[in-house]
Amino acid sequence: MAKEPNLKERIRQGITTIGVQVPSNATKSQIEDILGRDDEYNYISVDSQHNPLHEPQLQALCVVAQELSIPVHFRIKHTNYTFQIGNWLDLGPSIIEVPQTETEHTAQEAVDYFYYRPFGKRSWGGQTRVGISERSDISQYTSWWNEFGVLMLQVESIQAIVNIPRLAREGVDAISWGPADLGLDRAEHPHHPLAESDDAAINYASKVCTDTGVKLMIRNYDWKLRQKYIDMGATVLLESPK
């Protein structure tokens, strides 16, 4: 029997991967209830960009998620905090998303602090890291993590979309979509070809992602829009609970 692909392999292979938002203080029973509403969910998501960040709470949620064998997606607080990615990963998330990514410097710094040596420079430590209980040996764990964890960069402006070929690099698994801030940016640049509509910008980004070898992640929120964005080329989705 073929081995089931892990999270990173699944995303890299273009297998549709669907996440669902959960409260940052969700209990085990709450997470179980949300996951029970749709058997298509592959990960849960919490956000700190627009919500308070309480690290012990994030750690507790990650521990519960590990008990349920469900990966945690975590959007970090700010673009300029990429240097803290390793610290947050030590708490237990499996997926990191960097908001408002615009530059190659941000993309590379995210890669550097996401991966262990020799590919990155993430520091060793963290008692609740995902998978650490099964892999206490340093070389075993670091090799495993570098082939398991998922790194996403969020594009939220026309310039960021144009920059996707420069943001995409080894170690970046997906480009995620930021429709709200992008909408504001489109309004400021009404004559740019990508300002026509969100769908027009998505279609452009989908092609660029395909050409550069990264996957496209869309926050569709409403599960009824799932197929629409899959048809547009997104292979990773994030939804509100049903």
In which residue ranges do the predicted regions lie?
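Conserved anion-binding
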Residues: I95-G171, P179-L184
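C-terminal alpha-helical cap/extension of soluble enzyme domains
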Residues: R122-S133, G149-V162, H192, S197-K242
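Catalytic cores of alpha/beta
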Residues: I31-R37, F74, T79-S94, V98, ...
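Structural preference for beta-strand elements that scaffold enzyme active sites
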Residues: I15-G19, N42-Y43, S69-H73, S94-E97, ...
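N-terminal amphipathic alpha-helix/helix-capping segment at the start of soluble metabolic enzymes
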Residues: M1-Q21, R135-E147, Y204, D211
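Active-site mouth loops of central-metabolism enzymes
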Residues: I11-S29, H73-H78, G149-V162, K215-D222
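Conserved N-terminal beta1-alpha1 strand-loop-helix module at the mouth
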Residues: M1-V72, T79, R169
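Alpha-helix-loop-beta-strand connector modules within alpha/beta enzyme cores
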Residues: E55-Y81, D112-W124, Q140-E147, P193-I218
